[in-house]
């Protein structure tokens, strides 16, 4: 473990890149080409240290940032963290009640927000000084960048005796989901920054790479891979404001991207978007990543066949960061790659005993004795949920070569008459049907078996396949795994991170069908599939 994993570690990465390639682009806007070099990043970070120090902000002082993807957002993010304060990224699509709850708990010393997002009214109840983000390349009075760039840089921009230490808080990340009270995940500088070198090595990132990302930078995965991983390697980030199927391949082509990020939802959208791009037209592109949820094998194969672009899968958690990754050249279909050695990942049974290769069990992490899952409590204090060896909530298996394959989330398992069924397995089977473009399986109440298997399916526009035909198709599954009802849907609910929202589907089922729970008689359940959403 690195001796100094505080804020100075990040400052040293920036200084190293600025010294080696001062005029190299650190970040480029995919939309308008605006560029910030490593020399400019280095100088601005030094001015952030002066600005925050003058306001009396230091280690563990919380700075909230509400902004969409932009070069200014990332510059502010790195500036606050490199100065040693605690950056708290908040998704701009939170509702008023969620924001009120967040700021009541967070008690930030400063709130920075993007203008033009109608946030002024939403932030009225927040008891903290507020600053508009502004533009880095344009003089706009009373904005953050007008104030930061007007400061002289700190005298020793790469070494600060007042910087944050390894155990000080680096980031607080807020989930959105469907809860009225978003969960605040707290990571120390040690926990956060020690993830960066392994993930950069795990994905095979080099200084020559130009990484393209569109994902919201309120996510841990985007922050660590695309903001910090790029700086760690002295690479270049091509930053898009948001995902656009119509512009995705054009962005990759125009900016010479070598790595493109993605997730199962965007891969599915691209598959069904009518885009005709091919890897032959993108000679610089090495591979595309997928994370946030297991990528169904059918989608994985279809994407590579249609576009000729290798897909490499990785995984992680908000509480730790990236756990496993694999460069496109070494990928294995279905796997999320090799776990990072420092996290000492194991697959264990319910008693904590390590399982042999190929057996499915609980994914558990270790690495160092004080590893902990920490959350922001209702009173604003940090609560330790668990410490030591920690279970992520994922189910998976390791093969003989150490590659990890995830089978789903433990809390999403369907338990039918004592038999445990992975909904991902059923989804994957349904997705192999030629007319199915999305599928999500959930467990619903059943008077006899406790839970029964129900699948929601989106079919291709104009497809003649109905729910009855899909039930017949599923007869090839073992009888206890086969859905007892299939409901056609126009779309499936997703979380902010693009994951299937099975909880929302289960709640929809309860609302629509709780008064008449499923029966185990196959004839009755096949009689009226309906359309649920």
Predicted regions and their residues:
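Conserved AMP-binding/adenylate-forming core of the ANL superfamily
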Residues: 26-70, 74-78, 95-100, 104, ...
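Conserved ATP-binding/catalytic segment of the ANL
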Residues: 66, 356-358, 364-424, 431-432, ...
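Conserved AMP-binding/adenylation subdomain of ANL enzymes
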Residues: 193-210, 217-259, 273-274
């Amino acid at each position: 473990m690195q001796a100094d994993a505080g804020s100075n570690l990040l400052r040293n990465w920036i200084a190293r890149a600025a010294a080696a390639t001062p005029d190299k682009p650190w970040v480029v806007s995919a939309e308008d080409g605006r560029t910030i070099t490593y020399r400019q990043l280095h100088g601005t970070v030094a001015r952030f240290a002066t600005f925050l120090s003058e306001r009396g902000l230091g280690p563990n002082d919380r700075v909230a940032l509400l902004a969409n993807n932009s070069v200014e957002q990332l510059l502010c993010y790195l500036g606050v963290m490199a100065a040693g304060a605690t950056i708290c990224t908040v998704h701009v699509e939170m509702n008023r009640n969620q924001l009120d709850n967040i700021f009541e708990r967070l008690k930030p010393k400063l709130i920075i927000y993007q203008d033009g997002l109608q946030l002024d009214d939403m932030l009225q109840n927040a008891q903290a000084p507020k600053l508009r983000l502004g533009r880095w390349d344009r003089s706009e009075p009373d904005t953050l960048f007008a104030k930061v760039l007007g400061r002289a840089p700190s005298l020793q921009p790469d070494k600060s005796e007042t910087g944050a230490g390894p155990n000080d808080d680096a980031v607080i990340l807020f989930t959105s989901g469907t809860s009225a009270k978003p969960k605040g995940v707290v990571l120390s500088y040690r926990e956060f920054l020690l993830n960066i070198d392994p993930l950069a090595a795990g994905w095979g990132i080099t200084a020559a790479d130009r990484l393209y990302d569109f994902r919201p930078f309120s996510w841990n995965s985007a922050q660590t891979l695309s903001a910090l991983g790029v700086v760690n390697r002295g690479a270049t980030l091509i930053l898009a404001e948001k995902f656009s199927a119509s512009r995705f391949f054009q962005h990759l082509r125009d900016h010479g991207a070598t790595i493109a990020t993605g997730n199962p939802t965007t891969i599915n959208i691209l598959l069904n978007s009518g885009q005709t791009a091919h890897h032959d037209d993108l000679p610089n592109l090495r591979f595309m990543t997928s994370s946030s949820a297991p990528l169904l094998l059918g989608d994985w194969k279809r994407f590579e066949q249609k576009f000729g672009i290798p897909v490499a899968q990785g995984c992680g958690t908000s509480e730790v960061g990236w756990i496993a990754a694999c460069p496109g050249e070494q990928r294995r279909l279905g796997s999320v790659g090799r776990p990072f050695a420092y996290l000492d990942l194991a697959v264990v049974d319910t008693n904590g005993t390590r399982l042999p290769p190929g057996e499915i069990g609980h994914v558990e992490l270790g690495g160092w004795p004080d590893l902990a899952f920490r959350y922001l409590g209702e009173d604003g204090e940090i609560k330790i949920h668990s410490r030591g060896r920690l279970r992520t909530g994922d189910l998976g298996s390791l093969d003989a070569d150490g590659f990890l394959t995830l089978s789903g989330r433990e809390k999403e398992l369907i338990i039918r008459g004592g038999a445990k069924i992975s909904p991902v397995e059923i989804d994957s089977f349904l997705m192999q049907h030629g007319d199915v473009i999305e599928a999500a399986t959930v467990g619903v109440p059943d008077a006899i078996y406790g839970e029964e298997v129900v699948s929601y399916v989106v079919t291709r526009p104009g497809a003649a396949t109905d729910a009855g035909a899909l039930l017949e198709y599923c007869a090839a599954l073992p009888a206890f795994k086969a859905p007892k009802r299939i409901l056609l849907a126009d779309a499936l609910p997703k979380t902010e991170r693009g994951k299937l929202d099975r909880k929302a589907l289960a709640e929809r089922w309860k609302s629509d069908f709780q008064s008449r729970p499923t029966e185990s008689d196959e004839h009755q359940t096949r009689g009226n599939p309906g359309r649920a959403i």
